[in-house]
Regions:
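Aromatic (Trp/Tyr/Phe) and Gly/Pro-enriched flexible surface segments
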Residues: 145, 149-284, 302-312, 317-347, ...
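C-terminal outer-membrane/trafficking sorting elements
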Residues: 15, 479-529
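Beta-rich interaction/scaffold domains
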Residues: 395-481
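Extended, low-complexity, turn-rich repeat/linker tracts enriched in Gly/Pro/Ser/Thr and Asp/Glu
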Residues: 62-64, 293-302, 314-317
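Short, solvent-exposed loop/hinge segments that bridge or flank secondary-structure elements
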Residues: 23-52, 98-102, 173-197
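Edge beta-strand at a domain terminus
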Residues: 19-23, 36-39, 69-81, 127-158, ...
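Bacterial Sec-dependent N-terminal signal peptides
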Residues: 1-23, 502
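Predominantly extracellular/secreted and cell-surface proteins with exposed
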Residues: 37-38, 42-119
Length: 529
């Protein structure tokens, strides 16, 4: 009997670990306008084998539009350091809720009348917090954005990207202000760390640009410092911050032992308790940054630099080491930021070596000089780089649309609509292709019909799910027949996915082998990681 009770207790304990209820602030976004709804309960249940189920019951857009129960099963989970990222592109049926209206009467729920609804989900589990963003297509082509969690807007962005929060970093008796989530030489490692860690390179500054947002009160000020041997100035130490950790490992300034680096396996934390890495399970197209740079006295290389490496979470460093090149998925770099002593916004595009792999982390590094130890040696007039509002940019636009192999991109009107009469072929969703603008954009294709017409619609959704564009082809009085009446969501550039049995599928399961056909004509065999 005791053994039975022990087994029951263990089972109950296991169940409590697998299922968790979160109280999340809910914001509904319609046509670009945020509408706060209040707190709601969300269940996130671990299914096992790296899958979760997310349940948002009785979803009601602030009393204006009762939608119903949104339950998404088989949500893919990716462990990214101290965060579990959730991703899904699923066709689901939204069922009726059971919540009564204000008078205690049963409500009419919209969800069941929508049929299969293709929902895109990005979420994160971090400690006791859950954040998520969902795209839900409703009737009439309306796409509703659902924001869950107090930090939902920070998903897909760097931590403390506006540099509004700082903590005190220290080394021996030296102290400085480091932006939360960012790190200077004061928290560096390496055999030479003792020589550079006492220098103050970062400050919280109120030197924000004009016309900044009302809540933009601070930015980070990064300065170079002189390196001294006794009282003799022998070199310049570039002011540098990174989302990873700085390493001072060599007396030779240009050595790759002097670098920024990240590694999810690292358990170290900074003075604020944050890890020395930034989670980014997204595919941005560019990075926008506001900067103000002034070169100091004696600077013969008056160019500041900002770089970003998107990685798989394993060890990577900047400057790069060829031994770890396979861990890098994408790059962005600007090593020619001019000394203008005024605010300017720069946009740095990302390029991707591995277009099929989704990043897990971002190593972003900013320095007062693009040349190692190449800046000012002045103590009174050093190089100064102000940085504010780093933004990862996610594109959603249309590059090319084809129908039965014909390019019809320029035939759509300004609203993205195209009418066709007299079409007499069977409609096959695979004969309609759209090439999107957006490195990680999602392309959803759908064939629908009413009593009068048949429609082929495309929706391009940015990788962070916050922007989308549509194209719709209306076939007037179409009567020939429809093949493959369905909804299909695929990553940008993918034409179709097949399993080893030759069946077309809409998503891939970890560890399985697939044949992937691309819009550029290539076909590849791959294993889903």
């Amino acid at each position: 009997m005791k053994k039975i009770f022990t087994l029951v207790a263990a089972a109950l304990c296991s169940m409590s670990m697998m299922a968790k209820e979160y109280t999340c602030p809910l914001v509904v976004n319609m046509m670009g306008t945020d509408m706060p709804v209040g707190d709601v309960k969300v269940n996130v249940d671990e299914q096992g084998e790296g899958k979760y189920t997310m349940s948002l019951l009785n979803f009601d857009m602030n009393g204006m539009m009762p939608v119903g129960n949104i339950v998404i099963k088989d949500v893919e989970a990716t462990k990214c350091g101290n965060v579990t990222m959730l991703n899904a592109a699923k066709d689901i049926l939204i069922t009726a809720g059971d919540k009564k209206d204000a008078e205690g009467n049963a409500q009419e729920w919209m969800g069941p009348s929508l049929g299969n609804v293709n929902i895109l989900l990005k979420g994160e589990l971090k400690g006791d917090n859950f954040n998520a963003y969902l795209n839900i297509p409703l009737a009439g082509g309306i796409i509703v954005g659902v924001k869950l969690g107090k930090n939902c807007n920070e998903m897909g962005q760097l931590p403390n990207a506006g540099f509004e929060k700082f903590h005190e970093a220290s080394y021996d008796n030296a102290k400085s202000q480091e932006p939360n989530g960012w790190h200077s030489f004061m928290s560096s490692t390496g055999s030479m760390a003792g020589m550079v860690s006492a220098a103050v390179h970062t400050y919280a500054s109120s030197e924000v640009r004009e016309n900044a947002a009302e809540d933009n009160k601070q930015c980070v000020k990064i300065v170079s410092t002189p390196v001294k041997a006794g009282t003799l100035v022998v070199a310049s130490a570039n002011g540098t911050i990174t989302t990873g950790r700085l390493k001072a490992g060599s007396m030779t300034a240009s050595s790759k032992d002097n670098c920024s680096f990240l590694d999810f396996s690292s358990t170290g934390v900074d003075a604020n308790g944050d890890p020395f890495y930034a989670v980014l399970n997204n595919k941005p197209d560019a990075m926008k940054v506001w900067v103000k740079f002034k070169a100091g006295d004696g600077n013969k290389h008056p160019k500041a630099t900002i770089s970003a490496l998107l990685t798989n979470g394993e060890y990577a460093q900047d400057p790069e080491d060829k031994k770890h090149a396979a861990n890098i998925i994408g790059r962005a770099n600007n090593s020619s930021i001019e000394s203008k002593d005024e605010w300017q916004e720069i946009t740095i595009p990302f390029t991707y070596d591995n277009k099929n792999e989704m990043p897990k982390a971002a190593l972003v590094t900013m320095s007062t000089c693009a040349v190692p130890s190449g800046g000012s040696k002045s103590e009174s007039n050093p190089d100064v780089l102000y940085v504010d509002d780093v933004e990862m940019v996610y594109n959603a636009d249309v590059k090319k649309v084809t129908m039965d192999g014909e390019d019809i991109t320029n035939k759509f009107d300004e609203a993205g609509e195209l009418e066709i009469e007299g079409y007499n072929k069977n409609l096959d969703i695979n004969n309609f292709q759209l090439e999107a603008i957006g490195a990680g954009a999602y392309v959803t294709k759908k064939i629908t019909a009413d009593s009068f017409n048949t429609y082929v619609s495309f929706t391009v959704t940015s990788n962070d799910l916050k922007n989308c564009v549509t194209r719709t082809i209306t076939f007037k009085d179409y009567t020939t027949g429809i093949k493959n009446l369905e909804t299909l969501t695929l990553p940008n550039g993918v034409k179709a996915i097949y399993n080893t049995a030759g069946q077309q599928v809409t998503d891939m399961q970890s560890g399985q082998v697939y044949i992937v056909k691309y819009t550029n004509g290539e076909t590849k065999k791959m294993i889903k990681k």
